[in-house]
């Protein structure tokens, strides 16, 4: 791991040093550093340890009246002293993860222009498309290794949030550091401001983004190409993560660029990887194979279809043919089961459509296509996954029907935020007599049922993407492939308390997430080497590289460097 014992030579001093979040120590500057860096009189006289600072800021955090207030407060610490911010998260990750990311970050995105305090990251707007190289050069960090970028068109389940979507890259990169040990000095959040179709934002006098309807079509594609080209010129080896792009753009962008640069779409690939890791863990715990499952999805967008394709790939690794695997996956959208006769399906949806002959007779009543209950009933479903963004779609009747086919069904309502969840864990467990295995997209409290406490696994992408990023950075992989993602899923499954015999939760507790990220990083890096996408080394060398790149929040001694 990155140590804090070696001194760091810097040329900043006085107020400018205190204004640099990556370097500021606040009250922890030593007496000698205060003299050497002209800080005498700029800070209270008492010198504190980072532990004492954490105690103070945590006390202030607890005084915040609402979750949004807590989010704003944590962001203010991050913008003042990044080391202290991440040390605080390290001490209270369980408590603060829902504050810095889902579900609270959704409200922060909606209120972005109202709660804006200071700059962080880059805002690249369409009217300034001829100056993207200049904008990237203005980034104060030179050694960027991971970028998270959004165009804000599909922020969580909240839709188009304009530049307010910047909260997502900031939050995601905070998790890269807190969970995966990526130094904040190597991360950069970016929002692509291509306008907004959110009328409420366009009419809001406080909205800070470009007041224009969204650019689309060739203009949009050309703008993205300009951005990608500029990023490759500035940081040719960077990992670029696409985040919260609309369904119509997310998959095409990933398909276009995944073989040209090291890129990754967390909504599609990260969600798929953690979902498959969860499903693999449940199968291992039940002594079943993935190929024995019948999986029903509610929601057939890019995220749901991405999970489905990842499951199919995992089934094929187990020995099923592609056609056999596809017959075990059922995608239901607002019109019903995706079938060959359904019009207006996108290419990635067509690949998952069932043959009409195979589902003949499944439709009840006058519906043209089989509905969710029909599908669960006739398919003999054992797994139910929700990525619809619609509250309450997993009704009691649907869940009880699922329970008829499987003594321990896996139910995964993954929609965010909490207000959009398809069913709550309490409901699911009540309807299955406490026998369902439950993993959710948002955090939920443990459920008391039948005299026992059931801990609810949060099927959160933070279990996956930080480890993938750490592995890519450690081995310097040039691409991210499906096999690397599958390696991540398998590594996550092996960490499940149900598999290791250390508990009844499907996924490990968040307090273990840094160790989980290390294991995922090793699996990803080994697969990258096996595919010839990284320089081949020994496992010992990989482990050393992972530890060398794992940053821990602690203050280093500073020495003055002459300009």
From Swiss-Prot:
SMART domains: malic, Malic_M
Marked site: Important for activity: 267
UniProt cross-references to SUPFAM superfamilies, sorted A to Z: Aminoacid dehydrogenase-like, N-terminal domain (SSF53223), NAD(P)-binding Rossmann-fold domains (SSF51735)
PROSITE patterns xrefs: MALIC_ENZYMES
Chain sites annotated for binding NAD(+): 154, 267, 416
Ligand binding (a divalent metal cation): 243-244, 267
GO biological process: malate metabolic process
Coiled-coil stretches: none
Residue ranges crossing the lipid bilayer per the database entry: none
Name of the protein in its database record: NAD-dependent malic enzyme
Species the sequence originates in: Pseudomonas syringae pv. tomato (strain ATCC BAA-871 / DC3000)
Lineage of producing organism: Bacteria, Pseudomonadati, Pseudomonadota, Gammaproteobacteria, Pseudomonadales
